[in-house]
Curated annotation (Swiss-Prot):
UniProt-annotated location(s): Cytoplasm
Protein name (database record): 2-isopropylmalate synthase
PROSITE patterns: AIPM_HOMOCIT_SYNTH_1 (PS00815), PYR_CT (PS50991)
PANTHER family linked: 2-ISOPROPYLMALATE SYNTHASE 1, CHLOROPLASTIC-RELATED, HOMOCITRATE SYNTHASE-RELATED
Organism of derivation: Buchnera aphidicola subsp. Pemphigus spyrothecae
Region (Regulatory domain): 392-515
Binding positions for Mn(2+) per the UniProt entry: D14, H202, H204, N238
Recorded family membership: Belongs to the alpha-IPM synthase/homocitrate synthase family. LeuA type 1 subfamily.
GO CC entries: cytosol
Entry's EC annotation: 2.3.3.13
Length: 515
């Protein structure tokens, strides 16, 4: 199993700094408990001196932790340290994390000090923190741009003063892996008392190398990695914890290292943090992006169907995800189409694969991704009916009043009939349309997700709305495009209603075949 790498999460402190608005104490507690459940060793809950809200959050979280160690940030300022300790007074065990700029740039232009004064400030702060706890971390801010001899000198002195963890941050993401590896090795070679502490690293992603720098640091001897879930953080972000955790897991035989993280909790935690912080995870984000386990190439899909290891280095299940189906696009082959039909329970005797595949390609070329319900419509409904829209928008009117009430009226073609419904709600424009359409169709549909995308055209701005609706435990997706957000939303939902109508028609047809 090898030595353990301590995982230090700073999502609630360094990660939150990237958000436009601070999180409430309730939201921070929810994230903190999810991180603890995941097995994070140390959780930096905030910077208590920075605001009353941060103080309250740290104080609240400190009462709840059962296994994770809570940590608070403090400058080399007496009051900072006092407040940090006070905020964590209810914790069974806590860490004070002191930081100070050590690079010539920070020392001269930011702190307006000389290096000797910096040493004195650091020693004073550590001795002050020792009055409250034996668990003291000292960070050499901007260590990546600090001359190695100066870095070694301050590290040696803060260890003598009582620091138990020394953190080496690449604050602006300036170093590359070889350079960062050499910094860590130099500290082990030149600092005589380095064996008395845990050496930690805190990498930023300025050059896109935060994860690589963190891994090369533990190869050089560092035993704590600091980072954030989803790589949240100021500027280009921090080391993404999920990336280093999985890298250590996959390369455990080469690294001879391990963590105590419960890997199957990763996706649940990622999703919670993304939702609470209202941050969008790039679809191609390693480990946790929506495309991380997606395969659209026909060659890749064929390989995946034969053995998922052909194109996947980890399984979705290993991070807490259900098995993910193959995306159906114009690049998909017959094998993928047949696989999807089989997964839906359709015997090949019920349809003609060659005919279905040709129809599928035409649809995929026109719209991109094809969903299962569209595939079964192609298989079992004739072309004329497939292109006929049962539901069509005749007229709509939506008004949002200053009182917060939205009034909507929709006239909808339902086959040859026209149906009308009206709604008054305080739930906003989108929900007013959803509620009104629900009244007209009387279908048990549930709005699960909505995404707005603006497209700038030479003259106009086109608003695209993507909607996800659940119907009878099945997910349906629709898209609408218009200059008007209300019309885009209505189009997207009506697109879905037509697909639901076709899905129901397929069910009726198949029941008739069986009987």
């Amino acid at each position: 199993m090898g030595e353990k790498i301590i995982i230090f999460d700073t999502t609630l402190r360094d990660g939150e700094q990237a958000l436009q608005a601070s999180l409430t104490t309730k939201k921070k507690l929810k994230i903190a408990l999810s991180l603890e459940e995941m097995g994070i060793d140390i959780i930096e809950a905030g910077f208590p001196i920075s605001s009353p809200g941060d103080f309250k959050s740290v104080e609240t979280i400190s009462k709840e932790f059962k296994s994770s160690i809570i940590c608070s940030l403090a400058r080399c300022v007496e009051k900072d340290i006092d407040i940090a300790a006070e905020a964590m007074r209810f914790a069974k065990h806590f860490r004070i994390h002191i930081f100070l700029g050590t690079s010539p740039l920070h020392v001269k232009s930011k702190l307006k000090k000389n290096f000797s004064e910096i040493i004195d400030m650091a020693i004073f702060a550590i001795k002050k923190a020792k009055r409250y706890t034996b668990d003291i971390e000292f960070s050499c801010e901007d260590a990546g741009r600090t001359p190695i001899n100066q870095l070694c000198y301050i590290v040696e002195n803060v260890i003598k003063a009582g620091a138990t963890t020394i953190n080496i941050p690449d604050t602006v993401g300036f170093t590359i892996p070889y350079e960062f590896n050499q910094i860590i090795k130099s500290l082990y070679n030149k600092v005589p008392n380095i064996d008395k502490v845990i050496l930690s690293v805190h990498c930023h992603n300025g050059l896109g190398m935060a994860t690589a720098n963190s891994i090369t640091a533990i190869q050089a001897g560092a035993r704590q990695i600091e980072x954030t879930m989803n790589g949240m953080g100021e500027r280009a972000g921090n080391t993404a914890l999920e990336e280093v955790i999985i890298a250590i897991k996959l390369k455990k035989n080469n690294l001879n290292l391990h963590t105590n993280i419960k890997h199957k909790k990763i996706y649940k935690t990622r999703k919670l943090i993304s939702e609470i912080c209202n941050t969008v995870i790039p679809s191609n984000k390693a480990i946790i992006g929506t495309n991380a386990f997606s395969h659209s190439s026909g060659i890749h899909q064929d390989g995946i169907l034969k053995n998922r290891k052909n194109y996947e280095i980890i399984t979705p299940k290993s991070i807490g995800l259900k098995p993910i189906k193959l995306n159906l696009t114009s690049r998909s082959g017959r094998a993928a189409v047949k696989y999807h039909m089989t997964e839906m329970g359709y015997d090949e005797k019920l349809y003609k694969l060659d005919i279905l595949y040709n129809s599928f390609l035409k649809l995929a070329d026109r719209k991109g991704q094809v969903f299962d319900y569209e595939l079964e419509s192609l298989a079992f409904i004739d072309q004329k009916e497939n292109t006929t829209e049962h539901f069509r928008l005749k007229k709509f009117n939506v008004q949002h009043q200053s009182t917060g009430i939205t009034i909507s009226s929709i006239e909808l073609y339902c086959g040859k009939k026209i149906k009308t419904a009206n709604t008054r709600t305080k739930k906003g424009l989108v929900n007013s349309i959803y509620i009104t359409l629900n009244k007209i169709t009387n279908l048990p549909i549930y709005l699960k997700n909505i995404q707005l995308i603006t497209q700038k055209k030479p003259i106009n701005i086109i608003i695209s709305i993507k909607v996800q609706i659940e119907y009878k435990k099945r997910q349906f997706y629709g898209i609408g495009n218009s200059k008007d957000i209300v019309e885009s939303t209505a189009q997207a939902m009506i697109h879905i209603l037509n697909n639901i109508w076709k899905a129901n028609k397929v069910n009726i047809l198949l029941k008739n075949i069986k009987t």
